[in-house]
Design a protein with these regions (language model features):
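Fe(II)/2-oxoglutarate
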Residues: 1-10, 174-184, 200-285
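Transition-metal
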Residues: 1-126, 242-247, 256-285
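Short histidine-centered beta-strand/loop micro-motifs
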Residues: 38-39, 134-138, 146, 202
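Short, conserved beta-strand element in jelly-roll/cupin
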Residues: 126-129, 139-160, 173, 216
């Protein structure tokens, strides 16, 4: 049974994994580990289609196109028969933040956060269509793909978007796609795909299930996001900045002083702790 990050990536050490994260280049890991203890087809659908699972974190696609929720939701609840029909017709179900609803994934994410010190999100995709769940795209977090069941072909392009901003719209590349990696993942295999690498994948068997762990390091924009959220709790910070033009100099000085005081109080240890626990900005792909 896989209980933590070290057990998942063995024989690669956690230290070596951390180095690969810093290098920001794709890494293929072949393994025959018992990844089915993390998730299986039934437990995926039980969690993703449950009444407690947030609707905004669930997507249903067919031929790499997202389906409107009206096709599979009624009065706030998922229509399981509609999902079954989509899957029979070559569709996919994508569940973000799935680790919050699957204990084995929750333990793995908690272990990875403790070892790596970053904000980590667990997701999974179940698919039956040869077109894949999504069109070619890049993710805004470093992604560790864990193939759970079935086989999936992954094509990674060589022209990455460098350091994409979390939640920002996708930036299109004008360059013709050049494959950097074209590989087939079987159960137990893993692929570390740094943020910004455009990719697409196709189911190579009757059905496929994979887990994705998104690693989000602390960045300057994230620090500003955390500072802004902290300022929401301060009546003084929320006070309107108003006045005539002849008051601008005094208002600017007061604003600078307020922001500088917050910056001078910054603690990297406290920021890292907040980063791991506070939700990321909306728009996570």
């Amino acid at each position: 049974m896989i209980a933590d990050l070290a057990g998942l990536i063995a024989p690669l050490s956690v230290g070596a994994f951390r180095e690969h994260l810093a290098q920001r280049v794709p890494l293929l890991l072949r393994s025959d580990g018992d990844v089915a203890t993390l998730l299986d087809w039934d437990s995926f659908f039980d969690a993703a289609l449950g009444d407690d699972f947030p609707a905004r974190r669930l997507r249903v696609t067919k031929e790499a196109r997202q389906l409107p929720t009206v096709f599979y939701r009624h009065r706030g609840r998922v229509k399981r028969d509609a999902i079954a029909k989509v899957m029979e017709a070559g569709g996919s179900v994508i569940a973000y933040d799935l680790h919050r609803f699957v204990p084995a994934l929750a333990r793995l994410v908690a272990s990875a956060e403790a070892e790596i010190g970053e904000h980590i999100v667990g997701a999974a995709i179940a698919g039956t269509g040869e077109h894949g769940a999504l069109p070619a795209h890049y993710d805004d977090g470093d992604l560790l793909i864990i193939q759970i069941a079935g086989r999936k072909r992954w094509v990674v392009h060589a022209d990455p978007m460098i350091d994409p901003v979390v939640g920002a719209p996708q930036v299109r590349s004008d360059a013709a796609p050049v494959p950097l990696l074209d590989t087939m993942l079987a159960p137990g295999d893993m692929l570390l795909l740094p943020a910004g690498y455009r990719h697409h994948c196709m189911v190579a068997a009757e059905r496929s299930l994979h887990v994705g762990l998104f690693f989000y390091p602390l960045t300057a924009p994230r620090v500003l996001d955390l500072m802004m959220r902290a300022m929401f709790e301060s009546p003084a910070a929320r006070h309107p900045i108003r006045g005539d033009a002849d008051m601008d100099a005094a208002l600017e000085a007061a604003l600078r002083q307020q922001l500088l005081e917050r910056i001078e109080r910054l603690s990297l240890a406290e920021l890292r702790a907040a980063h791991r626990t506070v939700a990321l900005p909306e728009g996570l792909a």
